[in-house]
Structure formats: structure tokens, C-alpha cells
């Protein structure tokens, strides 16, 4: 487009920047930034979000990524539009396409969920999501400190990603504390319960499995239900437990059965194999039921595998 003398709008640059950020090519992302500057365009929060994403996805991983994340969050505080792309934005709104979806941000799937995300927190959404992906607890806590100093309030997405980060780093207590502080004062979406339960199962420690079980029981008490994706993810995670009574996996299976929800084949297969590894009679009702569900799924998918 540049070769043909077409002047790109700010929104087009930002789309390109975020698309390249997904590949981790920081050199190409910086090239877009230089082109924007040359065109008289300033960087807005979506540009800084793209820069954070680019460094998060960079391969091989860079040692300065945590510092870069903090740097971009700080720089974003002075963002402004030099050219406001009002017409494009209006068109996107009419088409019901949010900025989060347009720029493929981590919050895209929640953009139309009332009260799930506070849109003024975009840069923190992306930065804390990056911390969770990278498993960088130190960077997370630096961001949360910056967040608190700006007198912002957490939204569900911020808490969900912070909980995920803590759990990936093995800090179950901090994850539980953050979850409980948020849930005690605000409506808590099912996704947050699922994030805590699934993450607590990492490593299958006694403490983690206890937290996962308690979290699922709270979901049931509050009349939350698992959808097929949530159920599949949780069952797949719980089915990896090699010791213990398989209590959590059984509980998740029962939650799904109550709603007549059949999880995806890999989760059912993993659950079945976990049951078979335990000393369960071949005519046990649970084992028979799971085997039947597995057979039915296999018929839909193709040639039968050997599950015995």
C-alpha cells in the first residue's frame, strides 16, 4: 500500500502492529512504530499493548522482556491520539466489532460481557496476561503495585490473569487470597472459579487438589454450571492425577453429567484411563457409564481405539 502512495490510517497501522506482535517479530513491530511516527501518528494504548505482546511472544525468549513490559506500561500513561480515526471507529461500533476484537487482544472474547472488563485498563489487561503466560510473578507484583498507586479497581479479567500467574508460579496462597478478596466484594464469573480450580491442579499437590475441590464445590453452591469447554478443560486437568482417590475428576464428571454435558473426546479418554488405573471393579457403574460415553464418541469420530 505504501508503494502505491496510499496513506494508511491510524487504525490500519494498529491492526498491522498487533498482527505482527502475535508472531513475536519485535523488529517488524518496531518498523511499524517508526512508520507511524513518520506519518505523524502518536502511539495509543493499543500500540503499547502490541509492543508488550510482541516481546511476550518473542523467540527465543528475551531476558529483558519483564523490564520491557513494565517500561511499556509506564510509557502508555501518556498516550494520545495525534490522528483520531473517528470514522473507522464509528463503523466498527455499528458492526458490533470491539477494539479488543479488532486488534485481537487477550480480552477479545470478553469484550461484550457486561462488567467483565473495564476498557480503560487495556494496557494492564495485556501486561498481566503476559505475566501469566510467562510465569513471571515478580513482574506481576510490580504491575499490581503500579495499578494500586493509580487507584484503579480490579476487574474480573485482571484477577483471573493474576490468579493464573500465581498458580503457574506455584503460589497457591496468593492466588486464593486474590480470588477471595475479589469474590467477597464483587460478582464473580464462572471463568474465575474455573481458572482457580484448573490452576490449583498444576503439579497435583495435596494443597492444590484441596483448593480445586473446594472451588468446584463453591461453584455448585452458587448455582454455577460448567459449559462444555470449561468441563473439558477441567476434566482433562483433573484426570492427570496419578495418586489419591480421583475425587476431583469424579466430581467434575458428575457436575457435567447432572447437566447432560458430554466433554470432548480427549477429556473422556483421559478420565477413563485414570479410572482404569485404579482398583475399580469392571462392573462399577461409573466405569461402565464412562466406557459407554467413550464408545459413543468413538463411533462419531471414526475407527475404534483400544481403550482396555
Task: Identify the role of each PLM range.
Residues 1-308:
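A basic, Ser/Thr-enriched alpha-helical scaffold prevalent
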